[in-house]
A protein has these predicted regions:
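A short alpha-helical cap/connector motif
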Residues: 1-187
Length: 187
């Protein structure tokens, strides 16, 4: 997957876990990705939108992977501004993405397809208690849509992941890859 090379930047501190996740996804022939919390980008000089590498750039990477495998990325964010920015960054892959402006809990409850790869990254981790509780609720809703080979990638290790990790482990998932920022689980 040579397309990943362009995302390997010094500031993309999450690249290694995304690369590992997508390589496993390819081996497992995954086509359906669900992402809560879309890549925001950032504004420079009030009008120029550009990548925010510290965000990890999940949405463009997942979108390009979806194109590569003829799959679909379903990404939701409560902010219409974030969705608008993500649409600009991913315009070359628009056929392979569905955007949802919705709270992640509502979105996940209404999502009725099996999920191959679940990426939980909604709600900023500045308030670890609220973020952890929210991610746990996402996990509790999404688990029914996962299958035996599904992957779960949790972002903001140590803040948002505090409760969801234990929930997934109690439901027979195991940590298969871990960095300072993210945790990848599978059965």
């Amino acid at each position: 997957m040579k397309f990943l090379d362009k995302y390997k930047k010094t500031k993309n501190i999450r690249f290694n876990s995304f690369e590992e996740t997508l390589n496993i996804s390819l081996k497992r022939k995954f086509k359906t990705i669900v992402e809560t919390g879309t890549s925001r980008g950032k504004t420079k000089f009030f009008f120029i939108k550009r990548y925010n590498w510290k965000d990890g750039m999940s949405t463009p990477m997942f979108a390009e992977y979806a194109k590569f495998v003829n799959g679909k990325l379903h990404t939701c964010d409560i902010s219409s501004k974030n969705i608008k920015n993500a649409k600009k960054f991913t315009k070359n892959f628009s056929t392979y993405i569905e955007f949802y402006i919705q709270d992640s809990l509502t979105f996940l409850a209404g999502f009725n397809e099996p999920i191959d790869l679940l990426y939980l990254d909604s709600l900023d981790g500045h308030d670890p208690i609220a973020a952890s509780n929210h991610q746990l609720k996402e996990a509790q809703i999404a688990i029914e849509k996962l299958h035996d080979k599904s992957l779960i990638l949790l972002d903001d290790k140590g803040s948002k992941t505090n409760l969801s990790i234990n929930f997934f482990i109690k439901n027979n998932f195991k940590i298969i890859y871990e960095t300072n920022h993210q945790i990848l689980l599978s059965k």
